[in-house]
Regions:
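Rossmann-fold NAD(P)-binding glycine/threonine-rich loop
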Residues: 22, 26-38, 45-74, 84
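Rossmann-like NAD(P)H-binding beta-loop-alpha module
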Residues: 61, 65, 69-139
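C-terminal catalytic/substrate-binding lobe primarily of soluble NAD(P)-dependent oxidoreductases
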Residues: 116-367
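Alpha-helical scaffold segments in soluble metabolic enzymes
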Residues: 17, 34, 56, 60, ...
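Glycine-enriched alpha-helix->loop->beta-strand junction motifs that scaffold or abut catalytic
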Residues: 14-15, 39-41
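Short acidic, glycine/serine/threonine-rich loops at helix termini
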Residues: 54-57, 80-83, 98, 104-111, ...
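A structured beta-alpha segment of the ubiquitous adenosine-cofactor-binding alpha/beta core
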Residues: 1-17, 22-26
């Protein structure tokens, strides 16, 4: 294994698999594209890049005969492992998701305050080299929106509503809440991505028996005996027994990445990869009122946060994907809580924009 600070190291070493983990969408896209064109497999940890152009990178990888995969151990990859298993068993996925610990008071949080909200001291922050913007994206909800967008684009499962429902839920609540409205649940339609919040409705305390760091699926079957088996073997179900919960209570980001590396290098398979065109996008939302000249500071910043929406709606409304909200100054007034229009920032000319345009995403945001 080689840890490199610069993408040029790819030209110098005979590397089979590149793990992209910079956390910056433009840098991540450029690094991954270069690796793919050099014939290297890519394990994409930078989900901020994946949700902006991952389908284009995956298409390029397929054309080059190499693997582009998200990683085992991070929630999107862990969800895909569970989903692949469930579908192989013949189960129908009603909803796929992960846990969160989202306090409404954190929605407009500032990265300068993120470590304090976690209760982290300076020694821990320094020793683990923690990034305040990254940890702020965990607190303001952006990271969960990004990760479920990655799952959406791997599976074709859309969000049921913009930003997802994200109800406060215990493990036993999940198969009850993620059911069609006609059957007492929240969903307009089945086959969606969503979140289960560990924070109670009071916005302060935690729900008992929550799944904050885990991932889950609500599943059903057309076969009555199979539905009965899911309950008989002890899975949490809704009162009717029609829907059951599959879950894994943890994920080990970084620890499990070697699994995906081995899959790519030895088996030429992925943990999960985007479909050829995206199902969803993460759009940039103003955390506060923005005036011309204010600079967008990306995921976990003080000025913007991200929410998931269906790609068809994003393209129609010409909203700005979060991946383009890094370092650009807005040229118009944007109200707090408003989705930022793509016209509010200068022309996009980087690798992200180029990849989207050449992949035919239908909305390149490069003009």
């Amino acid at each position: 294994a080689v840890l490199g600070p610069d993408v040029e190291i790819l030209d110098l070493l005979n590397i089979d698999v590149v793990v992209e983990a910079t956390g910056n969408p433009e840098v991540g896209a450029a690094s991954a594209l270069r690796a793919i064109r050099l014939g290297r497999h890519v394990v994409m940890v930078t989900v901020e890049a994946d949700v902006t152009c991952g389908w284009a990178l995956a298409n390029e990888a397929r054309s080059q005969g190499v693997i582009y995969s998200l990683t085992a151990g991070d929630q999107p990859g862990t969800i895909m492992e569970l989903l692949d298993w469930a579908q192989t068993c013949g189960l129908k996925v009603v909803a796929a998701g992960r846990g969160t610990k989202f306090y409404p008071s954190d929605a407009d949080g500032n990265p300068a305050e993120a470590f304090g909200r976690y209760g982290y001291n300076d020694e821990l922050v320094e020793r683990r080299r923690l990034n305040p913007n990254m940890y702020n994206s965990f607190r303001d909800g952006t990271k969960a929106q990004i990760e479920m967008c990655a799952v959406s684009n791997m599976t074709g499962l859309p969000p049921d509503v913009r930003g997802m429902h994200q109800p406060s839920a215990s493990l036993h609540d999940i198969p009850v809440l993620f059911a069609p409205k006609a059957k007492g649940g929240l969903l307009e339609s089945e086959g969606v991505v969503d979140l289960a919040n560990a924070v109670s409705l009071d916005g302060q305390t935690l729900v008992p028996n929550h799944i904050e760091t885990g991932v889950w699926l609500v599943v059903t079957s057309e076969q009555g005996l199979i539905r009965e088996d899911l309950s008989f073997y002890g899975l949490p179900t809704d009162p009717s027994g029609e829907r059951a919960l599959l879950y894994r209570p943890f994920h080990l980001c970084g620890v499990e990445t070697p699994v995906t590396i081995a899959q790519a290098a030895l088996l030429n398979t992925t943990t999960g990869t985007p479909q050829s065109q995206p199902t969803s996008e993460v759009v940039a939302v103003a955390k506060r009122s923005l005036s011309p000249g204010d600079v967008l500071d990306g995921s976990g910043g003080k000025n913007v946060r991200g929410i998931i929406e269906r790609r068809s709606i994003v393209a129609r409304e010409e909203w700005l994907p979060l991946g383009f909200a890094y370092g650009s100054a807005v040229n118009q007034q944007v109200g707090a809580g408003e989705v930022i229009p793509s016209a509010a920032v200068p022309r996009q000319t980087g690798v992200l924009a180029s990849l989207r345009e050449t992949a035919g995403s239908g909305h390149s945001f490069s003009k």
